Amino acid sequence: MVERLRDVSKFANIQDMNWTVSYFNERVQREITEWPVGIYADYLRLILLMEAHGADLRLPHSRAMGDGLFELRCKNVEGIGRAFYCTMIGRKIVILHSFIKKTQETPDRELKTARKRLKEVKHAQ
């Protein structure tokens, strides 16, 4: 059906379910799986949305942090989780860093780690 709609209008904004999500390293992936169950469930829901529709979720689910860095905002009664990510050529999303939020502001240390990893990923491209 998607192909048929594309034939009808070249301007149709239909995205296939072919975005892939990967992790900066195994530690990042493991840390996220160790989040409280409710926060992790919200994370998985948002990841499925990104795989289906791309990385442009917007607030309240995602927020641009500048220079190609984005923040995935996972929330539940158990707390708040944040996962920083970037997009790559070829419909790829890379989860760079994650943490459980304990204060109103995003700690500088967490943001610096994400920005450093963003540079590493972009330079390896």
Per-region residue spans from a language model:
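Basic, Lys/Arg-enriched alpha-helical interface segments
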Residues: M1-I80, I89-I93, I100-Q125
